[in-house]
Amino acid sequence: MTNQILITTTESIPGKHYEVLGEVFGLTTQSKNVFKNIGASLKNVVGGEIRAYTEMMTESRDVAIDRLRQNAIEMGADAVVMMRFDSGSIGTDMQSVAAYGTAVKYID
């Protein structure tokens, strides 16, 4: 079985017939180290993008997608449709990201 499956935000995959296997999720909670948090606090005073947190969000998103993909593979899926993200803060320096969608298996 391949590690590469299609993950799409669309409702359907044009030209493919499939059965729904169920929901799949990928979850992660990330935080930056204390030094990056101090730098972010200083940046908060003067304004502008806080790159350490942007990087953390990008990393969190990638981890969540990888975990969603693994969850789908374990279910025997060929693809994930309707993939979405949700995120939220925990305290002042942690971020949770959930990637979720519907695992499907192609019908020949």
Swiss-Prot record:
Identify the Gene3D superfamilies for this entry.
Answer: Hypothetical protein apc22750. Chain B
Q: Where are the transmembrane segments?
A: none
Among InterPro entries, the record links this protein to: UPF0145_dom_sf, UPF0145_YbjQ-like
Pfam families the record matches: YbjQ_1
Give the family per the record. Belongs to the UPF0145 family.
Name of the featured protein = UPF0145 protein LCA_1282
User: What is this organism's lineage?
Assistant: Bacteria, Bacillati, Bacillota, Bacilli, Lactobacillales
